[in-house]
Amino acid sequence: MKPVELPGWVTEAIAPPRPLDTGGELLWEAGATLAEGPLWEEKTGSLLLVDIPAGKVHRLQPDAPSVSSLEVGAPVSSVIPRAAGGLVVTMIDTLVSVDDDGKSRTDLARFEGAGDRMNDAKCDPKGRLYAGSMSTSGGFTGSLYRVDANLEVVALVSEVGISNGLAWSSDRLSMYYIDTPLGTVDRFSYDPGTGDISDRTVVVRIDPGFGAPDGMCVDTEDHLWVAIWGGGVVLRYDPAGVLVGELEVPAPRVTSCCFGGDDYDELYVTTAREGMSDGELDRFPLSGSVFRFSAGVVGTPPVAFVG
């Protein structure tokens, strides 16, 4: 497919990390409408993330400190390194490659029947991309897809409301999944050879009054870290679904989290301002920021897309 020209990366210095009274650090006061999809990029020592409605991919380097931003077009819902070089992003109904210098993007694959737009995405241990879509009107018109190394798109789950968090167990036999309106974290049996999933069961139920599950990551102890939209927290659950820990975030709309840093013992958390009233923003002025916490455990490194 014909490449589309892009403006390239623009880099700016940002304020140094600032300690929070509740623990952790304010890493970047981004003012993002909907910061999402954080993922550690080991080769650059930076955090990748997107601001969905702004159509921007950000590369945040905590040690500089600086942020490089690239306008790829809205909405852009996830960003993942590509094993062959550059990045891949999910847009409305398309998987798109972005070259290293941010000067062009090229469509790779299309997600048929994707509902209103694509949302969260992550690679499995084999480098296959799992990407979900969503409805913006409260329906269940989304799906969860897998993109194989040959760029074939396989639909795995239908009638999805808002496809969100994905994670895999250390034995590579389970995949965890969040469809936000259901208020649950579900577990599938996962075949590492084929990438197929089956036997869906509920592991965690979130009280709707407390918030809704959004993004998710997993540590090397097979504990799940779940971002709670509307709850201002990241919750940690053991493999049986028992709540064993909580991190308070000074922004109610917590969107996602990932492990990063040299030893993958830091938890990076993204948040949003979308849909908040002026009064809410006055109470929570750091909404839309990126935060960092000492996790006390080690997380699993991300995997690049092999397609």
Regions from the PLM with identified roles:
Residues 56-58, 94, 143-145, 184-186, ...:
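A short loop-to-beta-strand structural motif that recurs across blades of beta-propeller domains
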Residues 3-31, 60-62, 200-201, 293-296, ...:
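A short helix->beta-strand "capping" segment at the edge of beta-propeller domains
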Residues 29-44, 72-91, 113-128, 156-174, ...:
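Beta-rich, blade/repeat-based domains predominating
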Residues 41-42, 47-53, 82, 87-93, ...:
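Conserved beta-strand positions in repeat-built beta-propeller and related beta-rich domains
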Residues 188-195, 295-300:
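Short loop/turn segments immediately following beta-strands, especially the blade-tip
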Residues 24-28, 65-71, 105-111, 151-158, ...:
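A short beta-strand motif characteristic of beta-propeller blades
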Residues 103-158:
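Hydrophobic alpha-helical segments and helix pairs
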